[in-house]
Amino acid sequence: MTRTFLALIFLLLTAVACPAGQHPLTVTRTADDFYAAFDRDILIKTKFCSVQAFQEKALLRSDLFGELVFMDGTRCSVDTVYVRKRLQWGTHKVTVTREEEGIYSLAGSETLLFASRCSTLALRDEAVLEMQDSLSGILHLHGGTCRVEGVFEAISY
């Protein structure tokens, strides 16, 4: 009974501190229109946002409009929110399209590969994704390789 009461008090206090639909994050711009909250395993795709952010505090608002609000008051419309996904260990044949430098989408899904510093162009090109563990791996594309630091799947927010 006491544990339940304490848990209820905790929930009430945190609800007051963070209004519904507002999620505090620390974000870094990883590519044009992409911001990562590495500590939360979240990747955010914005619409025409040019804020140069490195470990900047921001609020992800998941209300009707969907915005990423920076502490200086700058607001960016959010297109899609992605969360880290685990893939089965091993080799996967995939079809990829480069969205931005270091960001590749997998054909037929709402999944992105985050491969920073990878600039190989691709437009629905065949590739091999070699997952070394369930979270990271190597993308073999056009005879080159890129280190995949994360696989992210779109969520409704």
Regions found by a protein language model. Name each.
Residues 1-4:
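Positively charged n-region of N-terminal signal peptides that target proteins for export
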Residues 20-62, 90-108, 112-113, 117-120:
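N-terminal secretory signal peptides
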Residues 6-15:
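Bacterial N-terminal signal peptides
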Residues 9, 42-44, 103, 138, ...:
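Weak global preference for isoleucine
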Residues 18-26, 53-97, 123-157:
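Short, flexible, surface-exposed loop segments at domain boundaries
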